[in-house]
């Protein structure tokens, strides 16, 4: 996260809601920079960021319980506009002199709001007497308002569903405007930001790019940077941004573990060397990785072997270069947001990149993380700003351990080659059908099962290939893609005819939950 004040920003105080990140997404979509801070460090975050408005999140906690989370007093003493969502509304009311009780009539799911009076937050959106769908998820509810507040909208089970103190620019809602099930929610948040707080909404990837380049130059100076390039979108965008800032001071290392998709490593190397003039080392470590993985069937053991070998290989190559002062990483904002424990102290969970986890400490390097303020879709937008083609930016997610976790059971070179060919044919058919961009992720899985088949006049005993395709918004939940049978038949026929070693193809129709997207 940024360490300095950020003009025209919004501070989001997180009380532990599972959808707090959606609030940040809605603010960013309105063209405004924001940061999420846990309630325990909200005062420090307020002083550091110097925001122009504050949003208080929901929470699984109950405001009536002793020791439940509170917003720091400075937020209400500052004179800034405040928007309380669900628990945020309740704690705002309690802290300003109102009352909250445990609800006898809980509200979960779709509800309808009756607008009782006009409100500045409704400008161009809602009017008195209108009715609107919202999404509720609360047990407690406000029973008495603080001085200065008025009810502006109600629902059947929430007489204080939408309250406002227009003079102080305080607003509280019992529903969740940040979720898609509240159709006008994003517009309400936009009205709060633009109309109430007066923030322009001119934060863009172009402006972010310029600022990031300046910050990288100031941090790195004339020192050297190395970056682990995986071929994925995150590490690629980070590398291009660092390269724009410091040029030849950056060296990228692509450790090819032999577990990538067909022709993937060669394509990445060609693109970055030929089109972006990046100093890139392509390290062919396939024999090293596959040699240790052969016969290993436990998925967690596979991951640990791959992670350890990656660090060892990367470290060896970095030392051959004479080392570096900085390590570039494609860390994203969701990776660094602190998780909130509303029952105790802050529970900080910072995910390290699966490839370079322990490298900064081992090699005494400082991190350069130019994407750590961005969400995934913003990274893609920045990639376009930097000139990466849509065909690269829009690629489906690919796991760090690669094909190793799409080959359940023991791994062999032969199995990986069979899988690689089947996967390439499957993706080719998806692109030919114009379906690639409609699918979140699609891939082939080579099962550790052989079945009897007949090809020509001969009997075969070969592997089963499972095809997987899902639709999703964020990868947290997913549904299987509903192909027509003609497409599946065409893809299966090509795989069986063109890939020696497969004689049966099946399609995975499992959603997440209960299944996961990947098989291992």
Swiss-Prot record:
InterPro entries in alphabetical order: Class_I_gatase-like, GATASE, GMP_synth_C, GMP_synth_GATase, GMP_synthase, GMPS_ATP_PPase_dom, Rossmann-like_a/b/a_fold
Organism: Rhizobium johnstonii (strain DSM 114642 / LMG 32736 / 3841) (Rhizobium leguminosarum bv. viciae)
Encoding gene, per UniProt annotation: guaA
GO cellular component, one term: cytosol
Subunit and interaction comment: Homodimer.
Name recorded for this polypeptide: GMP synthase [glutamine-hydrolyzing]
Pathway entry: Purine metabolism; GMP biosynthesis; GMP from XMP (L-Gln route): step 1/1
GO MF annotation, one: GMP synthase activity
Cited SUPFAM superfamilies: Adenine nucleotide alpha hydrolases-like, Class I glutamine amidotransferase-like, GMP synthetase C-terminal dimerisation domain
Domain Glutamine amidotransferase type-1: 9-202
Superkingdom of origin: Bacteria
Keywords: ATP-binding, Glutamine amidotransferase, GMP biosynthesis, Ligase, Nucleotide-binding, Purine biosynthesis
Enzyme Commission number(s) from the entry: 6.3.5.2
Catalytic reaction annotation: XMP + L-glutamine + ATP + H2O = GMP + L-glutamate + AMP + diphosphate + 2 H(+)
């Amino acid at each position: 996260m940024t360490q300095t004040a950020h003009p025209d920003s919004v501070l989001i105080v997180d009380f532990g809601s599972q959808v707090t990140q959606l609030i940040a997404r809605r603010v960013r979509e309105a063209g405004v920079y924001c940061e999420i801070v846990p309630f325990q460090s909200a005062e420090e975050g307020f002083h550091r960021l110097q925001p122009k408005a504050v949003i208080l999140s929901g929470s699984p906690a109950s405001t009536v319980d002793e020791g439940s989370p509170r917003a720091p007093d400075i937020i209400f003493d500052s004179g800034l506009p405040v928007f309380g969502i669900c628990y945020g509304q309740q704690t705002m009311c309690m802290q300003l002199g109102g009352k909250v009780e445990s609800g006898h009539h809980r509200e979960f799911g779709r509800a309808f709001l009756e607008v009782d009076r006009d409100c500045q937050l409704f400008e161009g959106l809602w009017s008195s007497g209108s009715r609107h769908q919202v999404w509720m998820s609360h047990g407690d509810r406000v029973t008495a308002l603080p001085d200065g507040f008025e009810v502006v909208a109600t629902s059947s089970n929430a007489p204080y569903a939408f309250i406002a103190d227009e003079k102080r620019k305080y607003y509280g809602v019992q529903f969740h405007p940040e979720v898609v099930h509240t159709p006008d929610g994003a517009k309400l948040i936009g009205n709060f930001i633009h109309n109430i707080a007066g923030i322009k909404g001119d934060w863009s990837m172009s402006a972010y790019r310029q600022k990031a380049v300046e910050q990288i130059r100031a941090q790195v100076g004339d020192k050297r940077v190395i970056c682990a390039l995986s071929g994925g979108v995150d590490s690629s965008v980070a590398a291009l941004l660092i390269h724009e800032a410091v040029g030849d001071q950056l060296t990228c290392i692509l450790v090819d573990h032999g577990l990538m998709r067909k022709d993937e490593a060669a394509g990445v190397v060609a693109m970055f060397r030929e089109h972006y003039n990046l100093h890139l080392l392509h390290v062919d470590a396939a024999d090293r990785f596959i040699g240790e993985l052969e016969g290993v069937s436990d998925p967690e053991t596979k991951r640990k072997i791959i992670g350890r070998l990656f660090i060892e290989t990367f470290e060896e190559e970095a030392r051959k270069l004479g080392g570096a002062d900085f390590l570039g990483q494609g860390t994203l904002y969701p990776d660094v947001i602190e998780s909130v424990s509303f029952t105790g102290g802050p529970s900080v969970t910072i995910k390290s990149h699966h490839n370079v986890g322990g490298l900064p400490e081992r090699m005494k390097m400082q991190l350069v993380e130019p994407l750590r303020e961005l969400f995934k879709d913003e990274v893609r937008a920045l990639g376009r700003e930097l000139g990466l083609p849509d065909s690269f930016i829009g690629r489906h997610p690919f796991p760090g351990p690669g094909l190793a976790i799409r080959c359940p059971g023991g791994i062999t070179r032969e199995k990986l080659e069979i899988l690689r060919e089947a996967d390439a044919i499957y993706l080719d058919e998806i692109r030919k059908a114009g379906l690639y961009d409609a699918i979140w992720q699609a891939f082939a899985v080579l099962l550790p099962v052989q079945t009897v088949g007949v090809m020509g006049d001969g009997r075969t005993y070969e592997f089963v290939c499972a095809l997987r395709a899902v639709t999703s918004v964020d990868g947290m939940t997913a549904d299987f893609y509903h192909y027509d049978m003609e497409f599946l038949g065409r893809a299966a026929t090509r795989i069986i005819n063109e890939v020696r070693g497969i004689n049966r193809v099946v399609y995975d129709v499992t959603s997440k939950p209960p299944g996961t997207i990947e098989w291992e």
